[in-house]
């Protein structure tokens, strides 16, 4: 049976959510941060030491996008991916790649800059903040064109890949989404999905919903206080 290792309050939420959307059988293993980063149990499974990690027979795999692709095609009969024949195929592959190729790294860079003690008025910090603002406008504009989901009328894995950065990741770096009305409407639609609700119940029941404009409370500061 497929086993999914989820570190609470992390991007591995994508994999739990995906499995719930696909309604497939899987074994969920939950891990807590120790206190801020991956626990030894994750490092013992996967030498990179990051979540998610999935196991399927002799296979052990990390990387969100790889895990999503593997599960969709090995266990989900291709559901939540669009085939090349679909008219919105290009949108699907674009937003799927944009999520971890551009959007999430932009937030990660700003997290690193802040952790290094660089003031937000620093030219480099301002330049990277400007990049993130541009990317958020890009997502907001894309949602304005498609009106429902990133790849059009169908919910896809591109949405699953993107939502983490627009929600949970905001607890590690403050992002105010008040100016992005299409994103906010989109997030309200996301949390109505039974699959998303089921993921939260099983994987992160204590995590607040982060679908409003103002930046949520900083979870990283809570973790630091416990370190």
Regions found by a protein language model. Give the residues of each.
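Nucleotide phosphate-binding site architecture
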Residues: 68, 170, 197
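Phosphate-coordinating loops and pocket residues in cytosolic domains that bind phosphorylated ligands
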Residues: 44, 192, 201
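GST-like fold's C-terminal all-alpha helical module
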Residues: 96-194
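Acidic/histidine-enriched, glycine/proline-rich intrinsically disordered or flexible terminal extensions
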Residues: 203-227
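GST-like domain detector, emphasizing the conserved glutathione-binding G-site
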Residues: 1-126, 226
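A local structural micro-motif
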Residues: 27-29, 178, 198-199
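Short, flexible loop/turn segments with low-complexity composition
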Residues: 83-84, 198-207
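Active-site-flanking alpha-helical
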Residues: 72, 165-166, 199-200
